Swiss-Prot record:
It comes from Agrobacterium fabrum (strain C58 / ATCC 33970). The lineage of its organism: Bacteria, Pseudomonadati, Pseudomonadota, Alphaproteobacteria, Hyphomicrobiales. GO terms for molecular function: magnesium ion binding; phosphopyruvate hydratase activity. Catalyzes the reversible conversion of 2-phosphoglycerate (2-PG) into phosphoenolpyruvate (PEP). It is essential for the degradation of carbohydrates via glycolysis. Mg(2+) binds at D241, E284, D311. This is Enolase. The gene is eno.
Length: 424
């Protein structure tokens, strides 16, 4: 009844107006699953490869080759197989591709099929996706890491760090968490506007004011949390995504906005100062993706009291994560389905992290769609944290709205991760 009878891929547009792959998978019993694939702006060198067409069409960013791969080669290989055999099908597609980084068929082709298969199988079993993937224990609603000020590759301003996030750990449930975040977001907009700053929003819905430094951005956020009626370091904490690979040049960290260049040790100390001065409980990509020594220094400095998230460092890859665990670097992994390119490998990365006592943060990309799969996956994996942008742009809100629905579906079973994510 759950045999795959048809797969249809198409080229659609993401939130940045760039093409991406959408896949529909049909099963023998009439069930259908649909998934759209996200795309990143700051991508790690070790990520699985998106297949793009090149040429003039869409300025080289078309995905007709990936769509063609799904509709022909991938369907020919997996048509007729049982959609409930997720791991087997994912492994077949990886073997069919035959490259270490999915560059022949494209991670965007393989992932679209992988996610759509899970959604079709969930529909066939009469279960919501979070329950189908996560089983009976999937009930933990994640703390949202809401990206309200943008810099770096996500903004045209002098701020070197890419994201400044708020984490409403003091909320009682996801609905309250979203409300708290929304109130701080709108308060920040007023504060920025009153000081003459631009309040247009970036790719992920955050503001991109012309501030010179990370402390200047953090001061605005502290003020906005308080003015919205919350206590920084009690109701609401802060997270950073430095995306420091983007400004790591010739072995040094070049903070152009702040007008200084730091050696790895000094960069780690600068981040430690910020963690000690502000209620920062999470720092993502504080050091560059191949600066393992710098990562070790940072982990030794603040790893006992701050979540240190590897994004470009680990690229949702279990093998790289195991290397990091052995070396004692970082204590958390950012999970982006399109960095690794299949559902089963994504779930494996989360499991590897949890077994080693590392946390996992489910994440969107800067190029998103209305697809809300990651909301279900955050609950399915009980990872306790989700990063899906600000409180603006429907491509971000689709995920928050889905979490609100899931909480309602779970009823009294639902638990909100809240303060359980705090370290030390």
């Amino acid at each position: 009844m759950t045999a795959i009878t048809d797969i249809i891929a198409r080229e659609i547009l993401d939130s940045r107006g760039n093409p991406t792959v959408e896949v529909d998978v049909y099963l023998e019993d009439g069930s259908m699953g649909r998934a759209a694939v996200p795309s990143g702006a700051s991508t790690g060198a070790h990520e699985a490869v998106e297949l793009r067409d090149g040429g003039k069409r869409y300025l080289g960013k078309g995905v007709e080759k990936a769509v063609e791969a799904v509709n022909t080669e991938i369907f020919d290989a997996i048509g007729g197989f049982d959609a409930e055999n997720q791991i087997q099908i994912d492994q077949m597609m990886i073997a069919l591709d035959g490259t270490p980084n999915k560059s022949r068929l494209g991670a965007n082709a393989i992932l679209g099929v992988s996610l759509a298969i899970a959604k079709a199988a969930a529909e066939a079993s009469g279960l919501p996706l979070y329950r189908y993937v996560g089983g009976p224990n999937a009930h933990l609603l994640p703390v949202p890491m809401m990206n309200i000020i943008n810099g770096g590759a996500h903004a045209d301003n002098p701020i070197d760090f890419q994201e400044f996030m708020i984490l409403p750990v003091g909320a009682e449930n996801i609905r309250e968490a979203v409300r708290m975040g929304s109130e701080v977001f709108h308060t920040l907009k007023k504060e920025l506007s009153a000081q003459g700053h631009n309040t247009n929003v970036g790719d992920e819905g955050g503001f991109a004011p012309g501030l010179e430094s990370a402390p200047a951005a953090l001061d605005f956020i502290m003020k906005s949390i308080e003015k919205a009626g919350y206590r920084p370091g009690e109701d609401m904490y802060v997270g950073l995504d430095c995306a420091s690979t983007e400004f790591f040049k010739d072995g040094k960290y070049v903070l152009e906005g702040e007008g200084r260049t730091l050696e790895p040790g000094a960069m780690a100390e600068y981040l430690a100062e910020l963690v000690n001065k502000y209620p920062i409980i999470s720092v993502e990509d504080g050091m560059a993706e191949d600066d393992w020594e710098g990562w070790k220094t940072l982990t030794d400095l603040v790893g006992n009291k701050c979540q240190l998230v590897g994004d470009d460092l680990f690229v949702t890859n279990s093998a790289r994560l195991r290397d990091g665990i052995k070396m004692g670097v970082a204590n958390s992994i950012l999970v982006k389905v399109n960095q690794i390119g299949s559902l089963s490998e994504t779930l494996d990365a989360v499991e590897t992290a949890h077994k080693a006592g590392y946390t996992a943060v489910m994440s969107h990309r800067s190029g998103e769609t209305e697809d809300s799969t990651i909301a279900d996956l955050a609950v399915a994996t009980n990872c306790g944290q989700i990063k899906t942008g600000s409180l603006a742009r429907s491509d971000r809100l689709a995920k928050y709205n889905q979490l609100i629905r899931i909480e309602e579906m779970l009823g009294p079973q639902a638990a909100y991760a809240g303060r359980s994510i705090l370290r030390g």
